[in-house]
C-alpha cells in the first residue's frame, strides 16, 4: 500500500539507554505512554538481538522528531550510551545488520528520503 504521507526523512534514533541495560520494546512502550503518547512514537524499534519491532504504521504520523514527524519515518535502536552514560555507538552486529536491511527497504519505498540521525 502506498503511503499517503509525503516522506522525505528517515530519522535514526537511539533509546539513550546504557549498553549494560536491557530496554525491551515493552519498556519503550511504557515510557512513551507515560509521556502521553498513545503508543510508541517510532515506526520501528531494533533491540540488541537485532529483532525489528514494527511500532507505528508508516501511514501514521510518528512522535519522534518535533517539527519533522509529519514527513518522516522514525527508527530507534536499543542503546546509545556506554556503561557510564556517555553517548557511544553501542549497536551490536545484529542491530547493525537489521538497521542496514531496514534502511535499504525503506530507501526503496521512499527513494527521495534523506537518512539522518536525530541530532542531524
Language model features with spans:
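Short, highly charged C-terminal tails/helix-capping segments
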Residues: 116-120
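Active-site-adjacent loop/helix surface patches within enzyme catalytic domains
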Residues: 1-114
Amino acid at each position: 500500500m502506498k503511503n499517503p504521507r509525503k516522506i522525505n526523512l528517515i530519522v535514526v534514533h537511539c533509546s539513550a539507554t546504557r549498553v549494560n541495560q536491557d530496554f525491551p520494546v515493552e519498556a519503550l512502550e511504557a515510557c512513551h505512554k507515560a509521556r502521553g503518547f498513545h503508543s510508541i512514537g517510532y515506526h520501528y524499534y531494533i533491540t540488541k538481538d537485532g529483532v525489528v519491532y514494527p511500532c507505528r504504521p508508516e501511514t501514521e504520523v510518528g512522535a519522534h522528531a518535533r517539527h519533522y514527524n509529519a514527513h518522516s519515518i522514525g527508527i530507534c535502536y536499543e542503546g546509545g550510551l556506554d556503561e557510564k552514560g556517555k553517548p557511544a555507538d553501542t549497536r551490536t552486529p545484529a542491530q547493525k545488520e537489521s538497521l542496514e536491511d531496514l534502511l535499504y527497504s525503506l530507501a526503496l519505498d521512499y527513494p527521495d528520503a534523506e537518512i539522518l540521525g536525530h541530532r542531524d
